[in-house]
Amino acid sequence: MLIMLTSTLILVLMVLLAVAFLTMVERKTLGYMQLRKGPNVVGFMGLLQPIADGVKLFLKEPVWPLAASPILFIVAPIMALTLALSLWMLIPMPQSISTINITLLVIMAISSLSVYAILGSGWASNSKYALIGALRAVAQTISYEVSLGLILLCLVILTGSFSLQAFIYTQEHTWFLLSSWPLAAMWFVSTLAETNRTPFDLTEGESELVSGFNVEYAGGPFALFFLAEYSNILFMNTLTAIMFLGPLGSNNLNILPIINIMMKATPLIILFLWIRASYPRFRYDQLMHLMWKNFLPLNLALFTLQLSLAVSFGGAGVPQM
């Protein structure tokens, strides 16, 4: 029990540290793409900028609207960050802290609960703008979870298990990225929408609006939402690396599994940032059209194909008990 608590605490601290420096990497990346330096004053080449930002936010006085629901107003950001950090307990690096065989189902269940944090924050603010932003965010998140779920089902048919360890064993010789690249492309776009990133950042719309569901938040509670968003970005790209980019270990290269997964997840994270610098924002109707009229029929067709191939060739992948 003590070992598990210690492991969880270390994992949470490492994730929060990674999130802090991801914000600096994003600002640096966007800066160089716009022919400027980015943060370069606090510390060597701006390395301490995330620490300064965090200290500034958490030292601010907590304020909220007079007519807001104070308990739910504070609970919502705490819930968002707790759910985002709890997902990391399921990632095998090379062993996960939580040993369950239905990892993917639990991941989908926990990520679906983040909808309640968004909706609760918008409703508790007692602001019509925050509530409209929350409803818009919830509709977007729920829509793209349908796509993510169908893609996961297609891959589960190939592996024969809901465990992430099964994905590692199945991809010993061939990555799913090569054999199932349409699924990988749709998965990547769906993770962009699920994490509310450009070009699907209709939730916030920073260049047009002040913010979305968190428009009334400032200081510490706002920082918790910020940490939850970037933790989800790191998690989704790590999950993508495990599901589509092969096993954690390597028979040919003598490198640690954690280094291997970082080498595969980092280019995906940089691609997230690159997309923010390059693409304009979708209209909301285009966002929904892409999901319900493009991704959903294609996902259902691929799911039917995978299912029929599995039955035709004598069953799905070998179940990993």
UniProtKB/Swiss-Prot annotation:
EC number: 7.1.1.2
InterPro entries: NADH_UbQ_OxRdtase_su1/FPO, NADH_UbQ_OxRdtase_su1_CS
Biological process according to GO: aerobic respiration
Top-rank taxon, per record: Eukaryota
Catalytic activity: a ubiquinone + NADH + 5 H(+)(in) = a ubiquinol + NAD(+) + 4 H(+)(out)
GO MF terms, alphabetically ordered: NADH dehydrogenase (ubiquinone) activity
Keywords noted in UniProt: Electron transport, Membrane, Mitochondrion, Mitochondrion inner membrane, NAD, Respiratory chain, Translocase, Transmembrane, Transmembrane helix, Transport, Ubiquinone
GO cellular component, one term: mitochondrial inner membrane
Cellular location(s): Mitochondrion inner membrane
Transmembrane residue ranges: 2-22, 71-91, 100-120, 148-168, 173-193, 224-244, 255-275, 295-315
Topology with respect to the bilayer: Multi-pass membrane protein
Keyword S-adenosyl-L-methionine part of the UniProt annotation: no
Protein family (similarity comment): Belongs to the complex I subunit 1 family.
Function statement: Core subunit of the mitochondrial membrane respiratory chain NADH dehydrogenase (Complex I) that is believed to belong to the minimal assembly required for catalysis. Complex I functions in the transfer of electrons from NADH to the respiratory chain. The immediate electron acceptor for the enzyme is believed to be ubiquinone.
Protein name according to UniProt: NADH-ubiquinone oxidoreductase chain 1
Gene: MT-ND1
